[in-house]
From Swiss-Prot:
Entry keyword annotation includes Thylakoid: no
Leader sequence residues: 1-13
Disulfide bond positions: 21-122, 46-111, 70-90
Record-given protein name: CD44 antigen
Organism: Canis lupus familiaris
Annotated gene: CD44
Record note on domains: The lectin-like LINK domain is responsible for hyaluronan binding.
Amino acid sequence: LAWGLCLLRLSLAQIDLNITCRYAGVFHVEKNGRYSISRTAAADLCKAFNSTLPTMAQMERALSVGFETCRYGFIEGHVVIPRIQPNAICAANHTGVYILISNTSQYDTYCFNASAPPEEDCTSVTHLPNAFDGPITITIVNRDGTRYSQKGEYRTNPEDINPSNPTDDDVSSGSSSERSTSAGYNIFHTHLPTAYPTEDQDSSRVSSNSDHTPITKDHDSSVHPSERSHTTHGSESAGHSSGSQEGGANTTSGPMRKPQIPEWLIILASLLALALILAVCIAVNSRRRCGQKKKLVINNGNGAVGDRKPSGINGEASKSQEMVHLVNKEPSETPDQYTTADETRNLQNVD
């Protein structure tokens, strides 16, 4: 139980922040290896990094210099995934800045640092410059694996500090898993100004470009991010299929939604498991003590007084013993009687 309480305190007093490289000032932040950042906490976290939530234009600029993830995160006004290469398990196989219309409230976040270099910057971040005093141990985990810890706090909303809503137990950054909902998706797709793959896409998607001259091309052909322009597509229903590309047809889907497991339930289950283990150990120990065999000591009473004490314990057992006596019955006629009878018969025969 003491170990369980210790683990509970540690889980509540420590935050791990996994961050990526900066691309045109934009970077991704993940808390404690799962979707666990609210929109208010996202703004506070970016502020602690001396940054802000990026706008759509800033996210598109980051995409153009090579920024992509497989994790939903907050930007200004949206929840998005930036994708350059299509992947059936990331952003439903779409590319561009993929917008999610969600019915849940906790994801990762993206931040924008205006003082970062205009291209890619993978310099390690060592601290939260705008964090204030607090009891929480905040650990920054950079992409190269370096870790830097400090005591402090960055959240200002009491609901973010002591959440009452459960969070999704998801996987770490860059994983193939992502969140899927029953709501529709809006797509901010990017493409070449004079070409767009109209025939290879689903019929529900609407395409447009500056020339209004769509040219059919293979879906697998690559488009350099720097040559892309911003295009808005209509809402699309979140289907559930395998995302195959056979014969030029492209069927996409969102992954299965993971069940929501609150942190307090995980901690409670750990404590109950620990208590159960302790109870089993106590029961086994008690059974061993109660199950010890008692030795039966039989004394014939010839020893000293002290030696005869055990025989008193077994007195009842000795009283229950039965003595069996064998009694030899004598025959009704003695040998002398047999001899007299024989002589009488002999005399009668002589006469």
